[in-house]
Structures are given as C-alpha cells and as structure tokens.
C-alpha cells in the first residue's frame, strides 16, 4: 500500500486527478480496448472531478474511450431525481466531458428485480475485463461505497440496508431530513472493489482520521471496510495532513519520507504532457 500525504483537500484532488490522467494516457484507450474507470459520489471526489474536467478542457485527456462504473445508487430514486447518483454524476462530471452516454454505468435503483440488477452489473464489469482504476472516498466509519461496518470482505454487488450513521450523514443532501433519505441502496461489494487493478482512495479531514488509522495501521477487519485495502496489491491512499492525525509519528514519517519525491504537483502535471 502506498500512502501519499499532502497538505489539504486541494492538493489531494490535484494529485488524484493527475494520477488518473497519467494512467489513462499510459493505457492509450481505444474503442476495442477502453479504459474502465470506477467512480464514487459524495463530497470527497468533487474537487477531483473539477481537476479532471480542467485537464479535459486543456486538451490533455479525453474520455471518448473511457467506460465508467459508479459504486452505488439509492433504491427507489429515479435517474432524474436530484438526489440520485445518476443526477449527481451528470451535474458534477459527465456533462462537462466527452464521455459517451452508452459508456456510463450506474446501478439501476428502480429495477424491479434488485438481485438480477446486481448480477447484471457484476457481469457487465467482468465483460470489460474488470475495473482498470477505481477512485473512492471513505466514510467516517471506514465504509467504502455502501459497504457498511460488518460487510463481508468478499461481498459482491448487492442491495444493502444503510446504517443510521450513514443515513444521518447523507441527510445533508435531503434537506437535513433523515426521513427523506432512502434506507436501501445498491452497491458494489468489497470483493468487487478488490478485483480492480488499482484502487485510489481519497481521505480528507480530522473527522476521517480514525478511518485513515484503521486503513493504514489497523488490522484487517469487516468492521472497518477500508482495512481491506491492505490486501490489495496496488492500493493508493491519498490523504491530507488532518486525516493522518491519528497515525503513529513513526508511520507518518515513514510515508512522508518514502513518497517525498512523488508529491510535486507541478512536475506531475508537466509529466502528463510527455504522454501526449
């Protein structure tokens, strides 16, 4: 596992966007060999999406041959519902880039047969050879996507009942009314996530410092979904200074030292031009 420690959320967003762009450019996607990108929603990735949009507008990257799979969707919300993740992704990312509508994949929370929908989603991911890079955020309790504490670390895409803490946290998107928040969602599983060739997880802020601790120093446990990333051969944790406040000083110094040559944002962006 690599841990990249940066000053703040602006820097974690830039680093993450530049990393994604680099992998896309190195991959050289074509219609026959698309780059498959896994995406999250929520507040964490917003700045990263803006940075990716900037790179697209500057002509550095293209999404023409990129296929996306989102992590999750609420059950019972139609795609045109302003609180749905379909709507979120369109308004914050997709409408600003040149991705083809048919290349966008988000679980169908309106499906009449949720189990069949989850299997269809898994099968479609596999049909493209799996996720090339999965971008993710993490909750204060360490959940990734809607894999709440206690989720099986080998779980696949499925419907999941949301915990009270998650409902409470997400109520900020529903006029701070917990009664308006759906109680069920479709989510990729931890096993689905771990099948990705690379996982890039952004962690910002003091409130998520405990999640960062369990992800980096804790034991692997189903009670902290983020800890499963320790099992992945190519996991990247992109964290700001506030998020690593619970780490041991020795751990902090180790990662700051070993990654010291890999945090120059200007150099990272300049490097992208060499792949054009």
Language-model features: where?
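Class I SAM-dependent methyltransferase SAM-binding "motif I" and its flanking Rossmann-like core
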Residues: 145-190
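N-terminal glycine-/serine-/threonine-rich phosphate-binding loop
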Residues: 1-37
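Glycine-rich N-terminal segment of FAD-binding domains in flavoprotein oxidoreductases
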Residues: 26-57
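A glycine- and small-aliphatic-rich helix-loop capping segment at beta-alpha/alpha-beta transitions
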Residues: 50-62, 85-87, 149-158, 218
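Glycine-rich phosphate-binding loop
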Residues: 129-154
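Ligand-binding beta-strand-loop-alpha-helix segment within the catalytic cores
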Residues: 61-133, 251, 256-267, 275
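Glycine-rich beta-strand-to-loop/alpha-helix junction loops that act as flexible
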Residues: 39-44, 138-140, 204
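ATP/nucleoside-binding phosphotransfer catalytic cores, i.e., glycine-rich phosphate-binding loops
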Residues: 195-276
